[in-house]
Each structure stands twice: as structure tokens, then as C-alpha cells.
């Protein structure tokens, strides 16, 4: 499944219309939790909302606006652009991440941020200095990250090197119980715990908690209901009210000085060891995280090499490179006026920053989805560097990550993962050309509906031309041949024709970019379903009563029924067409379907159709 889509459905969207139930379990009202709770949304997640769940992004912004109307200050906190552990970044990279995060916040919420949430609450003095220099007024930390947190939840005053910032420390025990205990099963009990917090002499006590948004609906099913019920109860509580950090700071400026415990985070008690080495933090016991150190060291070496390449190859007429990086932002705004080399180097820097996204080190194994993602950023950064710079940097990277070993011996080390998971992604333009060829041959009109984030596509005779949107000087030209057994190509052979002597590459249709596969599916499904499904199944499909997985299996079952009726030579193409749907969905036929195919094909005499299906399904059929 798509993780963002799942969590959006279970949590982020649910919180935008959180349900308040009456005593009989009937829906009484909905509340937009973003109007009542302080929150932060990472810029990269917000970017995903823009394309896949714009209504959720709109509800989040609306919640912040409603809080501003009610309180005078919005609920939203900014976040550094990438989810990086800022104390492990250079000061220059800290500044860029914070500036990019502030800019994204301003664009979305139409105001300057008062506060900034630090990824994993990872903090040191330099990080807070950068926040203060960039106009941030407060952040939120775990109580163990400062010495002597101020009493009654009041903000503390951090001062260092002439800079000052307010620090809120959340209620650690309550936050822990919300995340890891049963608090969300009893909104009344949650409300009671808040009411029992000791009162200050002046009658003002602040109770704040901090937890992941995924707590409400994913980690705890129906957690959104508990939060909605609490909000409803607090609305009618004469002795407590929902507020936000910025409002508290305005009404109760800090009077207690706090001392920072440097290089700490809320999710690791080992001085940021979780993102450096095998510190003992893990999801499951018994696994080794010795891979963390070589992964970070390899990427640090590469980042140093990228920065050095920028210093060496940056065009003098483009101005100061690091100021230009900050100004261009993650979307490379305004780079059209820059020389091509400057644009390429800025793009390389964007990927160099993304290489340190914290989740790559958080979990248990090198072979999980997260480490290959940061390595793909590394591969793209290398691809953008000048000739002669790229090769030694890549060799040094591989030498270091070769020391990183997966806990599964079959998965190998960092080099094996680079070759298996990363180099495939590095062939992005070729895979895109393969997908465009498939669309051209199946449903050419759909090319008008193909919207790609990074490329513009043109057809010029037999050539497929790809033009990069941000680097218009990056143009590639391809020829492609498709191999069709069903309705869409099983595989595509592509060859770059603007460089002499380039060998053809071969791609299964399952690896072409998702926007292309979605258009191919939209064209293929009606053809396959009309040929294979019965009237009742088609009606269930139209009514949304037949899930995609069930529809694929029903189509495959229907195709085999046609083979039984019309023979393999006549109906084998329909079986291939049904299998095309699995490929386009990047799904594998279940074992039962493979066994059924073996039993259907084994008694039949050898034929090209039989052999092709056996090859596609990895069947070792008897020869006669």
C-alpha cells in the first residue's frame, strides 16, 4: 500500500472531520481538530497533499485560520523542510533547512510562523541559535531535554550567544500514556487527568502533550474519536480551555531560565545515537544496527564532495552559491535566469540535503524502504555533478556503504542494495520513455492527460523526447519497441538515440512511472473486465462493491474460463491481458492463482502461447 495514502485516510483526513458521538454512539457533530490543537505538517508531506489529498491540506490551513480568528494566533508550527536531525547537520545546512521550512509555511498559511517543531525534537545550541536568528520565537521539547523545566507547563527562556528563544516542555507522562497506553480508549478519563493537573498560585496551569499524528487512528484505532470527544468536553468546561503555544507565549512570557541538555531527542536516550550508530534503539530485539554508521559516513563523504564541487564549478556570474541555494528553495524558484551548470549544482544540493532524512536510520534494517530512498537521492545528486567529479565520489560512497550489512544475509550489503534498489531508479528517464511508448501504442490520446512533475514529453516521428522542467537544457531522445501479449506491453525495449552507441535497455511494464501506469490501467481495465467479468461482477464493480484485488482475480478466473471454452490459442491473449492488470498494479498473482494456472496448462500440448504463459508465471511445465 501507499503509506501516505493509508495514514491520510486513517489519521490526517479523519482529524479534519473528527466525529463526536453521543452516549448511544450516534454521530452528534464533527470538529476540525486542526482548529483546536497545535500541530506541524512537514513540507514534504504537505507537497504530497497538494497532489493526492488537496482537501486535507485545505482543512489543515482552514483550522489554522479559525484558530487565528478565535485566539489571535494560529495553531500551526513550521518545520525544517526535510525531516533531518539538525544537530548532526552543518550550520549552513541548518540555515537552509530552516529558511526553506519557513518559506513553505508562509506560502501555505499566509503568515510568518511563531514556532518551529524540530524533527524528533533533536536539539543543540546551534540549532536554537539558527531558529532565533530566523525569527522563530519558540519550540517544544521533551521535559528531559532541559534542566529544571519551568513549573506548571510555563515556557522557559533559553539564552545563548546573545540569542533568546522560548521553550515549552510538554507533559511527559501524559504524552507517553497517550502514545503507548490506553488513554485514548477513555476520553472522560483523559479529560479527568487534565483536570487533575496541579494548579499554579495564579490560577493558570498549562497542560500540553506532544505525540505523532499517526497516534490518532493508526497506532490507536478510533483515536480520532477520543480526541474529538476531548475537544468537545473542553469546549464546555468552565475551568479549562483549548489554546495554543503562541497565545500562551503572548499572555505569559517566560520568566524562568532553562539550560539545554545538548544533542538530545525525544526518541533516543543515547545522545542522537539512533542516527549515528548501533546505540541499542530498535523496533525489534535481536537485530544489529551496525549499518547505521557506514551509511551516514558514506553520505557525509558524498555531501562534502558535492559541496566542494559547487565551490569549484559554480559560475562566477551566478553570484554566491549558498545564498543562491537559500533563495532558490526546494522548488528552484527563479533559476531560469541562471547558467545551466548553476541549475544542475543547485539540484544536486537539493538532493544532498534530502539524503539525511532521519527515517533512513530510525528503523531496524538497511534493506527497509527508507535507506534506499536516501541512497536514490545520492544517486541523483551524483548524476548531476560534472564529469570527472562523479566517478571518484561514487566509488568512495560504495566503498563505505559496502561496510553496511543487512540483518538478512540474502539482502547483502550496501553495495548490493545500491545495485538492486538504487540503480534501477537511476534509469528514470529510460523507464519514463518505456511508459510513454506503451501509452503511444495502446491509447495515444491519453498522452494529453499525462502530467509529470519533472518532465515534458514530446513525440517527434518515431522519437520520444523528454525535456526536464527545471533544467530545460537536459533533453533526451529515445526510440522504443513494445512487446505485447495481452492489451498492454509486457516489456519495452528502449534505446537513447541522441548519444551514439547506446545499448537498448529492457523494462517490464510494472516499473514504469506511476502516472503512466495509472493511465494504462484506465485504458486496460474496461477492455479486460468487459471480456472476463459476468454481468453481476461488472455491476458490483460499478457500485464500488468489488475491490481492485478481487476484480483482478475475477478477471483472471474469467480468462481461464474462456480458455476452457475457446481453447488456449484463441483465449490465451485474454489470460495475458488479465495478468497485465497485476503488472500495472505492481501486484503478484497469489499462489493459488499460480497453482491454478499450472493445473490448467500442464495437460495441454506445448505451444508458443503455453510457453509464453509458463514463462510469465514462472512455471516449469512438462514438455508433453
Regions found by a protein language model. Name each.
Residues 463-553:
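Terminal end segments
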Residues 4-114, 122-176, 188-203, 221-224, ...:
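Catalytic alpha-helical scaffold of carbohydrate-active enzymes acting on polysaccharides/glycoconjugates
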Residues 60, 77, 84-87, 91, ...:
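Non-catalytic regulatory/linker segments of enzymes
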Residues 389-496:
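C-terminal amphipathic alpha-helical interaction region
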Residues 533, 537-624:
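Eukaryotic RNA-binding helical-repeat scaffolds
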Residues 1-21, 44, 153-438, 516-525, ...:
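Active-site and substrate-binding clefts of carbohydrate-active enzymes
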Amino acid at each position: 500500500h501507499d503509506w501516505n495514502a493509508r495514514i491520510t485516510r486513517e489519521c490526517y483526513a479523519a482529524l479534519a472531520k473528527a466525529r463526536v458521538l453521543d452516549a448511544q454512539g450516534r454521530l452528534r457533530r464533527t470538529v476540525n481538530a486542526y482548529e483546536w490543537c497545535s500541530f506541524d505538517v512537514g513540507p514534504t508531506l504537505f507537497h504530497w497533499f497538494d497532489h493526492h489529498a488537496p482537501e486535507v491540506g485545505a482543512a489543515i490551513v482552514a483550522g489554522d485560520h479559525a484558530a487565528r480568528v478565535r485566539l489571535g494566533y494560529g495553531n500551526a508550527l513550521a518545520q525544517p523542510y526535510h525531516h533531518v536531525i539538525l544537530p548532526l547537520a552543518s550550520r549552513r545546512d541548518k540555515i537552509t533547512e530552516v529558511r526553506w521550512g519557513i518559506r513553505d509555511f508562509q506560502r501555505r498559511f499566509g503568515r510568518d510562523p511563531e514556532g518551529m517543531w524540530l524533527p524528533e525534537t533533536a536539539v543543540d545550541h546551534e540549532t536554537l541559535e539558527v531558529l532565533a536568528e530566523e525569527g522563530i520565537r519558540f519550540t517544544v521539547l521533551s521535559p528531559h531535554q532541559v534542566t529544571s523545566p519551568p513549573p506548571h507547563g510555563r515556557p522557559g527562556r533559553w539564552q545563548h550567544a546573545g540569542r533568546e528563544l522560548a521553550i515549552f516542555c510538554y507533559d511527559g507522562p501524559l504524552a507517553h500514556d497517550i502514545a503507548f497506553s490506553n488513554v485514548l480508549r477513555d476520553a472522560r478519563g483523559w479529560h479527568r487527568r487534565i483536570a487533575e493537573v496541579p494548579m499554579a498560585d495564579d490560577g493558570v496551569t498549562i497542560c500540553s502533550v506532544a505525540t505523532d499524528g499517526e497516534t490518532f487512528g493508526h497506532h490507536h484505532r478510533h483515536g480520532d474519536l477520543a480526541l474529538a470527544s476531548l475537544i468537545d468536553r473542553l469546549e464546555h468546561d468552565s475551568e479549562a480551555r483549548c489554546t495554543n503555544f503562541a497565545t500562551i507565549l503572548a499572555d505569559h512570557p517566560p520568566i524562568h531560565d532553562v539550560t539545554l541538555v545538548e544533542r538530545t531527542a525525544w526518541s533516543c536516550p543515547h545522545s542522537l545515537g539512533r542516527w549515528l550508530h548501533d546505540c541499542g534503539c530498535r523496533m525489534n530485539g535481536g537485530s544489529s544496527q551496525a549499518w547505521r554508521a557506514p551509511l551516514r559516513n558514506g553520505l557525509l563523504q558524498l555531501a562534502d564532495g558535492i559541496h566542494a564541487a559547487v565551490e569549484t564549478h559554480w559560475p562566477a556570474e551566478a553570484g554566491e552559491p549558498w545564498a543562491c541555494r537559500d533563495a532558490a528553495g526546494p522548488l528552484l524558484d527563479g533559476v531560469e535566469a541562471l547558467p545551466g551548470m548553476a541549475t544542475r549544482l543547485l539540484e544536486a544540493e537539493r538532493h544532498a540535503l534530502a539524503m539525511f532524512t532521519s527515517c533512513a536510520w530510525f528503523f531496524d534494517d538497511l534493506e527497509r524502504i527508507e535507506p534506499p530512498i536516501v541512497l536514490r537521492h545520492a544517486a541523483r545528486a551524483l548524476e548531476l555533478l560534472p564529469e570527472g567529479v562523479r566517478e571518484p565520489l561514487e566509488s568512495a560512497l560504495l566503498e563505505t556503504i559496502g561496510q553496511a550489512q543487512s540483518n538478512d544475509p540474502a539482502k547483502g550489503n550496501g553495495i548490493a542494495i545500491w545495485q538492486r534498489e538504487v540503480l534501477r531508479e537511476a534509469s528514470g528517464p529510460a523507464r519514463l520513455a518505456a511508459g510513454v511508448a506503451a501509452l503511444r501504442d495502446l491509447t495515444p490520446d491519453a498522452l494529453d492527460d499525462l502530467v509529470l512533475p519533472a518532465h515534458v514529453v514530446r513525440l517527434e516521428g518515431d522519437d520520444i523526447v523528454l525535456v526536464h522542467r527545471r533544467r530545460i537544457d537536459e533533453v533526451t531522445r529515445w526510440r522504443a519497441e513494445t512487446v505485447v501479449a495481452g492489451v498492454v506491453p509486457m516489456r519495452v525495449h528502449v534505446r537513447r538515440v541522441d548519444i551514439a552507441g547506446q545499448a537498448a535497455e529492457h523494462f517490464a511494464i510494472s516499473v514504469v512511472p506511476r502516472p503512466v501506469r495509472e493511465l494504462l490501467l484506465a485504458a486496460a481495465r474496461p477492455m479486460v473486465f468487459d471480456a472476463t467479468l459476468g454481468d453481476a461482477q461488472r455491476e458490483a464493480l460499478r457500485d464500488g462493491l468489488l475491490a481492485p484485488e478481487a476484480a483482478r482475480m475475477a478477471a483472471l478466473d474469467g480468462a481461464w474460463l474462456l480458455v476452457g471454452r475457446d481453447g488456449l490459442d484463441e483465449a490465451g491473449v485474454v489470460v495475458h491481458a488479465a495478468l497485465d492488470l497485476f503488472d500495472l498494479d505492481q501486484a503478484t498473482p497469489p499462489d493459488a492463482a499460480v497453482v491454478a494456472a499450472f493445473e490448467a496448462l500442464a495437460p495441454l500440448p506445448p505451444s508458443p502461447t503455453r510457453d509464453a504463459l509458463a514463462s510469465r508465471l514462472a512455471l516449469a511445465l512438462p514438455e508433453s
